[in-house]
């Protein structure tokens, strides 16, 4: 392969890697700006759970926490 083709492939790969990393950081920033709570964090009517997780409260409607979905638990148990 010529050096020009190798350089082009390297540059395209680097741009792809950087774009994927930037997308991950952007999605994390959007969720934190939105004010949502992660798994096993406190939640309320004003502080929703991220990623559509359910907000589960105790019997007297206190100590509410975000729980993982069944899909997330299944993926953790059986691997991705």
From Swiss-Prot:
Any GO CC annotation of this UniProt entry: extracellular region
Residues that span the membrane, as ranges: none
Keyword rRNA-binding annotated: no
Keyword Secreted applies: yes
Domain of life: Eukaryota
Residues making up the propeptide: 23-34
UniProt signal peptide: 1-22
Xref: Pfam families: Toxin_9 (PF02819)
Subcellular location: Secreted
GO molecular function: ion channel inhibitor activity; toxin activity
CDD domains associated with the record: Spider_toxin
Broad class of where this protein is predominantly found: secreted
Disulphide-bridged cysteine pairs: 36-50, 43-55, 49-66, 57-64
Entry keyword set: Disulfide bond, Knottin, Secreted, Signal, Toxin
Tissue expression pattern: Expressed by the venom gland.
Similarity comment: Belongs to the neurotoxin 02 (plectoxin) family. 05 (U19-lycotoxin) subfamily.
Domain remark text: The presence of a 'disulfide through disulfide knot' structurally defines this protein as a knottin.
Protein name: U19-lycotoxin-Ls1b
Organism field: Lycosa singoriensis (Wolf spider)
């Amino acid at each position: 392969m010529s050096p020009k083709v190798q350089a082009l492939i390297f540059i395209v790969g680097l741009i792809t890697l950087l774009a994927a990393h930037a997308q991950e950081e952007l999605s994390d920033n959007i969720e934190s700006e939105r004010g949502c709570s992660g798994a096993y964090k406190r939640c309320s009517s004003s502080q929703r759970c991220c990623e559509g997780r359910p907000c589960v409260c105790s019997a007297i409607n206190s100590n509410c926490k975000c729980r993982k979905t069944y899909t997330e638990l299944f993926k953790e148990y059986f691997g991705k």
